[in-house]
Amino acid sequence: MKIKNKYVVGVHIMFYEIEMVSEYIDSCIGMIQNIENKENLTFHFTWNISEYFESIDTTKISKEQLSNLFNLQVNRLSNLDVKTIIEIKTNDDDVYNIADYRRDLNYNYCTKYDFILWGETDSLWPKETIEIVEQVEEYSKNNNISKYVLFFSERKMWDPSWQPIEHNDFTDVTFIDNNDWALNNLSSSKSYMTLEQMYEVNSKAESLDVRILTNPKFDGSCLVIKSDLIKSGVNIPQSLLCSGEDTSLADMAKLLLGDSFVQYVIKNILRVHNRRHPNKRLYISNENNPRGFCGDAKGNWWNILEQMSKHNLGTIRQQSHTYTMKDVFNKIKKG
């Protein structure tokens, strides 16, 4: 198919995520296979090998080997005559994380592309992604909707507030809050699902079940953003240090648009967010936490960073101290 709109698909990849990259690239290849005018597509990557918080375990792998693995995967897209942009972050740069990346992606590319797509290393794009966005955009134009986000559905989540974005096949499942069920049952949003398994779920959809939400409910993995939303001033606040960048975007969108906010949810097309991917955090010195559990499993630095970031998020509309990365490092040093 020939597409009318221009797309940038961006992902921030930390060195410890390298063993998940091939699956992410597989999903990117899957969603562009039927696109004739691939010049309308750009894939943006930031490869982050900085070690401000996590150090590379060089007894297992070197920086050069990590970068070679990264380039090998990105070249799979480049070899399909798709434009790829790579930026690299090291300790020569300031601290840079997914919140910085997504803020910059939004700001730098909203005037160059019609849609900004947030990828995530542990997530998988539906192969129908571009085709669906094109269809929804046609509907939006006909109904004078120019600022919106689009989100594919999720498997069973851990609390009822997520039900509006759960896939039709999973919404009636009971979430069991223990690791035995949550990490192993394919209905659970915390379990590992392959690209082929996602494709199988999506193959059942004979027509699209599209819902419209006026209150935002999404996370940052496989989020589709109409650039007009960013142009109008919606973005991740600079005060957001790391954790909660997706929530902050949702909050700012609702704050600016109010009752005019629009989120499309494709209730019968699944995208996968493998939150507890078995290879989520590898090659980190003095850490054995491959599934990426938060809290003490990551280290006290994470608790400090998360706490300060969430404080900033929760006090955006209040008179309150705004923490900075300097505050984070000072508290880490104090122990």
What is each PLM-predicted segment?
Residues 54-113:
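Active-site-proximal specificity loops/subdomain of glycosyltransferases
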Residues 5-13, 28, 41-47:
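Hydrophobic targeting segments
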Residues 106, 126-237:
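Conserved catalytic core of nucleotide-sugar-dependent glycosyltransferases
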Residues 23-40, 52:
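Short, acidic, metal-binding catalytic loop of nucleotide-sugar glycosyltransferases
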Residues 48, 119-122, 153:
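Active-site acidic Asp-centered loop
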